[in-house]
């Protein structure tokens, strides 16, 4: 099914199928009851990207059918936020009529927030010169009559800012609002509503944890900042420079004082923890000052490498957020040698697709 054809009437059925699929995938383990967290059935995605198709004077957003690989025009995109749908058609109508802006336009990316900020990236197969900047500023001025919008231009080895390259998301988590700087072309959770539920679940499962929290793959601090209230200190690692910079900004924006971000991979952190290698990035930080009894991991689809698996087995509590049931299954086969799964959750980040986000909370036996 094409994402443009989703039907809200089918939502509960597709969620039930996912619940059954996840339960079957983990039936070889002793798992607690699965907690399922639903999504809004429409307008749940905070970001979207489209290729552009030029046909004479016409210009369309297009996607490609996964079965036939044929392109099809996208006039409205029901999974995306309302503001993305509103902006994409208004912007397209203006760009179509502007030769400077439309020529060799290859792709448009949209990043929005729950408070209706939106950042639009126009991607080109041509160098962007002063004339493009002038026309892009005029386009932004027209769109700002209706929208809280910024525009970026990208081309090969080129990124042109009109103002800023980020949006500020305000995310409700229980009875508190968290502010997150989300940078263009960096990873963010696509489904803000489900992300809030995922953070509330993580807060709930760790509410009685003692000591400090270690988080690997922390991104811009999506988990680190809300979870800081449950721990004395939070020590978090991330390899991406832009994500680390955003995380530092987010710490300041939320006035949180007990989170420390380290720019290093999980593999490097294991080396540092085992005194196998020294890092200048750890200057002024003594890992022995932390009493990390809980670890949170949110790894890529490939899951955890063997060294990281061996390392986290030493922790009393493990929160594992997974975007790939297959690698979670493989990793659980190792972790279940020392830990019991006491909470198990499905987060429907990607409705109407086969993709599943899940969470497990494990405690050492």
Curated annotation (Swiss-Prot):
Keyword field contains Transport: no
One Gene Ontology cellular component annotation held by this UniProt entry: cytosol
Gene Ontology MF, one: tRNA (uracil(54)-C5)-methyltransferase activity, S-adenosyl methionine-dependent
Residues reported to bind S-adenosyl-L-methionine: 189, 217, 222, 238, 298
Record: active site: 323 (nucleophile), 357 (proton acceptor)
Pfam families for the chain: tRNA_U5-meth_tr
EC code: 2.1.1.-, 2.1.1.35
This protein's record includes keyword S-adenosyl-L-methionine: yes
Reactions it catalyzes: uridine(54) in tRNA + S-adenosyl-L-methionine = 5-methyluridine(54) in tRNA + S-adenosyl-L-homocysteine + H(+); uridine(341) in tmRNA + S-adenosyl-L-methionine = 5-methyluridine(341) in tmRNA + S-adenosyl-L-homocysteine + H(+)
Group of enzyme by EC: transferase
The organism's place on the tree of life at top rank: Bacteria
Biological processes annotated in GO: tRNA methylation
Keywords: Methyltransferase, S-adenosyl-L-methionine, Transferase, tRNA processing
Family to which the UniProt record says this protein belongs: Belongs to the class I-like SAM-binding methyltransferase superfamily. RNA M5U methyltransferase family. TrmA subfamily.
PANTHER family per UniProt: TRNA/TMRNA (URACIL-C(5))-METHYLTRANSFERASE, TRNA_TMRNA (URACIL-C(5))-METHYLTRANSFERASE
Function: Dual-specificity methyltransferase that catalyzes the formation of 5-methyluridine at position 54 (m5U54) in all tRNAs, and that of position 341 (m5U341) in tmRNA (transfer-mRNA).
Full protein name: tRNA/tmRNA (uracil-C(5))-methyltransferase
The species this protein was found in: Pseudoalteromonas atlantica (strain T6c / ATCC BAA-1087)
